[in-house]
Amino acid sequence: MDRTLVLLKPDAVKRRLVGKIIERFEEKGLKIVAMKFMQMTKDQAKTHYSVHQNKPFFNDLVNYITSGPIVAMILEGAHAIEIVRLMSGATDGSKAQPGTIRGDYSMGIEKNIIHASDSLEAYNHEMPIFFSDNEIIEWAYGDEVIY
């Protein structure tokens, strides 16, 4: 099974969209294997966005992602990276298709609700910034209902 890192950014948290977004992933059949509510540090943000460090918008990215709490999670499933990217929609919310997370909840590129790893290499770079291996929980869906 493939895994991907997803960050629900400060605007998703502030707008109370976390539950709705997680529900979409679960309904699609993706499994949460790690999740935490956290405040990203500047150092974590700089490491996370290091591929953009020489771009003019780098400091804005760092300041925005550290402006409030986020939800970090690892989702697991067949083709998880590709599926989550499709579900997320275009990076610029004003260009994202309706029915995608950004298409439904974002109006622009700056506050665009969600980050999702765009490749296995990106996941391998990003995951250790937010999770240790012992925070990833291996589990299986059960068919029985437990009360």
Curated annotation (Swiss-Prot):
Q: Where does ATP bind?
A: K9, F57, R85, T91, R102, N112
| Cofactor(s) needed | Mg(2+)
List the catalytic activities from the record: a 2'-deoxyribonucleoside 5'-diphosphate + ATP = a 2'-deoxyribonucleoside 5'-triphosphate + ADP; a ribonucleoside 5'-diphosphate + ATP = a ribonucleoside 5'-triphosphate + ADP
An annotated GO BP: CTP biosynthetic process
Q: List the disulfide bonds.
A: none
Under Enzyme Commission nomenclature, its number is 2.7.4.6
Q: For this UniProt record, give its keywords in alphabetical order, as a comma-separated list.
A: ATP-binding, Cytoplasm, Kinase, Magnesium, Metal-binding, Nucleotide metabolism, Nucleotide-binding, Phosphoprotein, Transferase
The UniProt record lists the keyword Transferase: yes
Q: Where in or outside the cell?
A: Cytoplasm
Q: What class of enzyme is it?
A: transferase
Gene3D superfamilies linked: Nucleoside diphosphate kinase-like domain (3.30.70.141)
Which SUPFAM superfamilies does its entry note?
Nucleoside diphosphate kinase, NDK
Which PROSITE patterns does the annotation name?
NDPK, NDPK_LIKE
Query: Per the similarity annotation, which family is this?
Result: Belongs to the NDK family.
Per the entry, what this protein does is: Major role in the synthesis of nucleoside triphosphates other than ATP. The ATP gamma phosphate is transferred to the NDP beta phosphate via a ping-pong mechanism, using a phosphorylated active-site intermediate.
NCBIfam families listed in its UniProt record: PRK00668.1
Q: What is this protein called?
A: Nucleoside diphosphate kinase
Species annotation? Thermoplasma volcanium (strain ATCC 51530 / DSM 4299 / JCM 9571 / NBRC 15438 / GSS1)
- State the gene name recorded for this protein: ndk
